[in-house]
Amino acid sequence: MIPSTVGHSAALPDLACDCHMHVFSDAYPIAATATLGSPPASLADYAVVQQTLGLQRHVLVQPSAYGTDNRLLMQTLSTTPSTARGVAVVDSAVSDAELAALDRAGVVGIRFNQVQQGATTMEMFDALAPHVNELGWHVQLHLMPSELIRQAPRLAAAKVPIVLDHYARLCASPELIDETWLTLIRLMATGNTWLKLSAPYLASRPDDPAFSQLFEFTQRLVRGHVDRLVWGSDWPHVTETSKPDDAQLLNRLQRLLAEDSAAERAIFCRNPAALYHFDE
């Protein structure tokens, strides 16, 4: 039933990419550190959503449910090598051979999820960053506003590209909205930080007045930093009991772009191609 959450969306440009989705399978054990799980959600299930939305590429993100066991990620990537890339989860004990195998499988980054904390901590960042840099990968971060503000000096000084998940959770802490926004803008001004326009319901609940403010922030980002924005569906929306309509969320972003075809192509095609090593 998972794919049925999608409605109908406006047309996307050719080679549009979903930069944040997950798969789940009962064939792989849930990590002892996991705080979130999901019913099975396969690549075949996702293909229904992908086709309906008009997407041709996707980025498979290792969910916290599997910790550092990236076997499902690698197996899934092997089925669509030209149109998919992966973001893995590793800890500081990872070997060069393991990193090389992930690289061959199509992995282009590692993720630190500090919201549903599990297998990794930010204390591992400095040890892993040189390996990431050597491979030409990036570091993807899921942080709450207070942690983003605290980590900002480290991220600004990082020698690797940084990708912030889920609108950087901009409006998730109302008392920190202004400081979070300023922190985000300063990081993006370095030219080394990307923002993922994914899961707006995690940045602010749809029934919260701040939800509209989130899209006002997005308009400002499009005007000033469109070359550092990518979009992701967050399918299959494991944090949500009532699943959102993927097409409705996508359409809202498309309306915000106000028929700016250059911005749309940047967010859905050109930027993902650069960040995730796709051919343009």
Feature roles, as predicted:
Residues M122-W231:
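Catalytic pocket-lining loop regions of alpha/beta-barrel enzymes
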Residues M1-L15, P39-R57, R220-R228, S242-E280:
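Mid-to-C-terminal alpha-helical segments outside catalytic/metal-binding sites
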Residues C17-M21, H58-V61, A84-A88, V108-F112, ...:
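Hydrophobic faces of well-ordered beta-strands that scaffold small-molecule active sites
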Residues G67-P153, K196-A203:
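Active-site gating/metal-coordination segments in enzymes
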Residues A32-T80:
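Alpha-helical scaffold segments that flank or form the walls of functional sites
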Residues P40-V48, S92-L102, E179-T180:
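Short, acidic/polar
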Residues A16-C17, M124, L128, V238:
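A generic "structured core" feature
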Residues H20, L73, I110, V132, ...:
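Conserved, mostly hydrophobic/aromatic
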